[in-house]
């Protein structure tokens, strides 16, 4: 595809995967793989990197950590922080941006374990048609135009 890409993460495993797939990796001490990560910094760096790279992967792990720790309220609070920072980011970045939001797996906060529920996927931005879904969760997105699909199909849907 000829895209130059970068991955912003605080997680060593994701850094390794990014490197193997040809993405550059951006990490700072403030960008952790935990609930204390500096989301403002991550989104700021993502915005700066969009000016230099065609693809920016912004990895945020805090929700998974809270779920593994069986702390659903912390998971909810962290999701709200992500939502707030994403909202600020989208107000600044009004260019021909395309955005995919998803997860690599679901984690049940009650038991702290991974589960095989489908993960929600949101595609947003230039050239992507909206649908009637107004809430982003595992149940509501099943009513959207993407429906259920295998994650290996995400790339094709993103660039369709």
Language-model-detected regions and their locations in the chain:
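Feature captures the catalytic ectodomains and active-site-proximal regions of enzymes
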Residues: 1-160
